[in-house]
């Protein structure tokens, strides 16, 4: 997957630009008054479309690369890989382009891998017919174009992007107004690293601080009324300040652990790994995830869960003993995750101090596991 890094890096920087400058709640729009999203609306829309195209290309190339490895013969390789690319683009992207649906920025590798095995099985099963009727691939290609048209205009809910949308809706229904007890917050938070490990799409509620819950509104009303907040333990107050630094599983801790371990051992670090740091700092983990083996890697899952659990338990204790004020204020899009706690607490400097301590602790948790990984960061 490292061959796809340039596409992921370009996508990440487009998202960074959009969230910092062009979105409705962009960081500089709210902090500096730069309303570039209004003045350059057409440019913003084109960037959004282009970022979707980049993700489609990345997904399609991922499937194509897996098909190449499974095909294991040079004959018909060009036709097979071309068919794989078109099929992936059709099934994932046609409805997204037509209905302007956002694509999942943390790819569902497991679903795409299963699609590859299904696709290769179909192609190998029809191999003898392809040799007998050379025109059959053209018929399949025309059928795919027709399928793309149907997906874009009438069957969009049955495309893969439609499946992701229904999964997101189902998850939102299940979680309701969000967990408001520390045990339920811990349980929901641990679901994110598990889904990332399994290569399944992670609901947006678990990857970004969500302001859609009623508990957040009630907390803000209580603060403005100078009363005790009714819900001190929520995803916004427990998970968002520390456990989402760099992404689910405290990815920034993993990055710093890999970097410091290689420096300590005197090993070289790849340019791709270094270039993924700034996007990771600005809440875009996709380039970093393409340089680190996360999919079905127990050596990554265990410290991801431990880091999330330890950091959130410490946050619960800090809030319980009133050593920290809960984060209740909404922050702009694109806010670096290391500054979230400081801004969402209305400038509580203790969040910056605890952030350093929490990152060092997560590095310590990841360190022994990084020492066992092979080829990471090279």
Tell where the protein language model's regions lie, with residue ranges.
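Aromatic-rich transmembrane-lumenal/periplasmic boundary elements in polytopic membrane proteins
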Residues: 146-216
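Hydrophobic alpha-helical transmembrane segments
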Residues: 44-59, 177-198, 227-249, 340-364
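Early transmembrane hairpin of solute transport permeases
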Residues: 1-128, 295, 313
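Alpha-helical transmembrane segments and their helix-start/interface "positive-inside/aromatic belt" motifs
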Residues: 1-9, 69-78, 131-144, 180-190, ...
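Helix-loop-helix junctions within the multi-pass membrane cores of secondary transporters/permeases
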Residues: 215-304, 308
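Transmembrane alpha-helical segments and their short flanking loops
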Residues: 30-36, 288-378
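Transmembrane alpha-helical segments in integral membrane proteins
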Residues: 57-73, 121, 193-200, 237-267, ...
């Amino acid at each position: 997957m490292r061959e796809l890094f340039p596409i992921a890096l370009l996508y990440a920087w487009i998202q960074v630009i959009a969230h910092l400058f062009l979105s409705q709640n962009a960081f500089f729009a709210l902090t500096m008054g730069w309303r570039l999203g209004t003045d350059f609306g057409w440019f913003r829309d084109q960037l959004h479309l282009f970022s979707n195209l980049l993700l489609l290309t990345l997904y399609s190339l991922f499937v194509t690369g897996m098909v190449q490895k499974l095909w294991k013969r040079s004959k018909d390789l060009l036709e097979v890989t071309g068919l794989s690319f078109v099929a992936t683009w059709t099934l994932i992207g046609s409805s997204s382009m037509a209905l302007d649906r956002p694509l999942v920025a943390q790819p569902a590798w497991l679903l795409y891998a299963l699609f590859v095995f299904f696709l290769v099985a179909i192609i190998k099963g029809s191999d003898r017919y392809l040799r007998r009727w050379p025109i059959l691939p053209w018929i399949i290609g025309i059928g795919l174009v027709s399928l793309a048209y149907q997906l874009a205009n009438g069957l969009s809910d049955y495309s893969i992007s439609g499946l992701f949308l229904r999964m997101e809706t189902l998850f939102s229904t299940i979680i309701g107004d969000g967990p408001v007890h520390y045990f339920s917050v811990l349980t929901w938070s641990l679901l994110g690293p598990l889904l990332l490990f399994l290569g399944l799409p992670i609901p947006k509620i678990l990857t970004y601080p969500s302001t859609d819950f009623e508990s957040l509104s009630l907390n803000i009303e209580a603060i403005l009324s100078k009363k005790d907040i009714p819900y001190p333990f929520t995803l916004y107050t427990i998970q968002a300040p520390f456990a989402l630094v760099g992404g689910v599983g405290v990815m920034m801790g993993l990055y710093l652990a890999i970097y410091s371990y290689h420096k300590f051992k005197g090993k070289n670090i790849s340019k791709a790994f270094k270039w993924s740091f700034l996007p990771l700092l600005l809440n875009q983990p996709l380039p970093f995830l393409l340089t680190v083996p996360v999919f079905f890697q127990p050596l990554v899952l265990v410290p991801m869960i431990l880091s999330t659990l330890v950091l959130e338990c410490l946050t619960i204790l800090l809030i319980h003993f009133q050593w920290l004020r809960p984060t209740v204020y909404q922050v702009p899009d694109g806010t670096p995750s290391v500054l979230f706690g400081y801004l969402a607490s209305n400038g509580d400097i203790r969040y910056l101090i605890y952030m350093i301590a929490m990152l060092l602790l997560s590095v310590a948790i990841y360190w022994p596991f990084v020492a066992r990984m092979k080829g990471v960061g090279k």
